[in-house]
Amino acid sequence: MTITPVYTTFTPTKTPIKFFMAGLTFLIAHISHADDGRTDNQEPINQEIATLEPIINHAQPELLSHDALTPKIEPILAQTPNPAEDTLIADEALLLDNPDLLNHALNSAVMTNHMAGVHALLPIYQKLPKDHQNGILLGYANALAALDKGNAKKAIDELRRIIAIMPEYNVVRFHLARALFMDKQNEAALDQFNKLHADNLPEEVRQVVGQYRQALKQRDSWTWQVGMNLAKEDNINQTPKNTTQGQWTFDKPIDAITLSYQLGADKKWSLPKGAYVGANAQIYGKHHQNHKKYNDHWGRLGANLGFADAKKDLSIETYGEKRFYGHERYTDTIGIRMSVDYRINPKFQSLNAIDISRLTNHRTPRADSNNTLYSTSLIYYPNATRYYLLGADFYDEKVPQDPSDSYQRRGIRTAWGQEWAGGLSSRAQISINKRHYQGANLTSGGQIRHDKQMQASLSLWHRDIHKWGITPRLTISTNINKSNDIKANYHKNQMFVEFSRIF
């Protein structure tokens, strides 16, 4: 494909914004980063808590973009390129010999937001002698190219330089506001969008600006999550299948109807330069109507300070947790968590966390523990309808007064999420862990305890089945623990329909 230049000069006004803002979609995506799978082993009957996502709660990315509430520009171009071609081929020698032609060609590509043309012509334009270059045009083309490649910071620098020279040009101001939005500089982005909104804009442009302003307000609004499921759960007391082993006799496995619930709220307050502070609260647990001594309820409060831009989100959080087991106070936990969410490129994302905590056991004071978790995940998005996750974890629990309860756990996990044709969606997850304890106990035959654990789940839902913003999900899960400690061998299955909503 060759370039047909449009002979106009680079004199942006308020009207060219119509050309590149003709098409608009409003894309909403949510990545639920659930808990990272930290398991408290200091429980009566060694029961592991599973909330609404009972198996691999390390990272639950939804499909599509990681950023939420991001309007997406789909411009109408002055030319109609061949859909089979991704790039434009330009005669570099011809254009360098004709600086006016090159200026007009790049100007045409910039003013129509024709990114293939901008990417093809910009490297050639940069080879022109300085006295043949238009500095504003060069900066604007650099900014658009940087935005197209996701380099919001470079685009912001270029666009701020231009807007300082030409503050009345709203087409430039719009791209500056959009770059600030991408870089999560929320206060600065809102300031630019407010200036645009106050001007005399065409109605279609005003609607786009309004959607960005609304998206920015929602970034700082309260987010609520409510969910519950009712399930028939087997072996809630997690006892061995064989209740008599040698001189030991164990309770029979108990099957029960389990109500699992979760309620959460969180909020961020944006600060300058992409910084923010946040607060969150959660309650979750399990209720067994006919076996209340196995009821398990948790509450958590957290406050965090962070920094986010288009590529990364860095956060440090302090939190406190309270747990009640069988309606009695069981444990208190205080901790600090550091996390890094980094978008490597549009296809890959990494999630990393370090969590250090102190647990106080009110039922068994000698079981107080110091805990450390290291967690990392890599997510691959081959397209907008699929993702794959691979993760690894290391958890160290030290119980100073009882080495037999101290252990280290190493694990790997994987997940696959898919949107199928016809509206069906699925998520499959599996994790494999090994625990190595520091001491022996009576039921391990005097040997140091070693456990192998496998957890797996499959969730299915239909995207067209929803009511009041709730899409029911069918989940089947299994949890197998094999140990040389005879009381720690168990196998339990669950099947339930989950109802949850985020708003």
From Swiss-Prot:
Residues 221-503 are annotated as: C-terminal probable beta barrel. Residues 38-220 are annotated as: N-terminal domain. InterPro entries: Slam_C_b-barrel, TPR-like_helical_dom_sf. Consists of a soluble N-terminal domain and C-terminal probable beta-barrel in the outer membrane with 14 predicted beta-strands. One of its GO terms (cellular component) is cell outer membrane. Required for correct export to the cell surface of some cell outer membrane lipoproteins (tested with TpbP) upon heterologous expression in E.coli and probably also in Moraxella. It is a multi-pass membrane protein. Keywords: Cell outer membrane, Membrane, Signal, TPR repeat, Transmembrane, Transmembrane beta strand. It comes from the Bacteria. Residues 1-34 form the signal peptide. It comes from Moraxella catarrhalis. Its main location: membrane. It is found in: Cell outer membrane. The lineage of its organism: Bacteria, Pseudomonadati, Pseudomonadota, Gammaproteobacteria, Moraxellales. TPR repeats lie at residues 136-169. The chain crosses the membrane at residues 222-232, 259-270, 275-285, 299-308, 313-322, 334-343, 348-358, 372-382, 387-396, 410-419, 424-434, 454-463, 470-479, 493-503. Belongs to the Slam family. This is Surface lipoprotein assembly modifier.
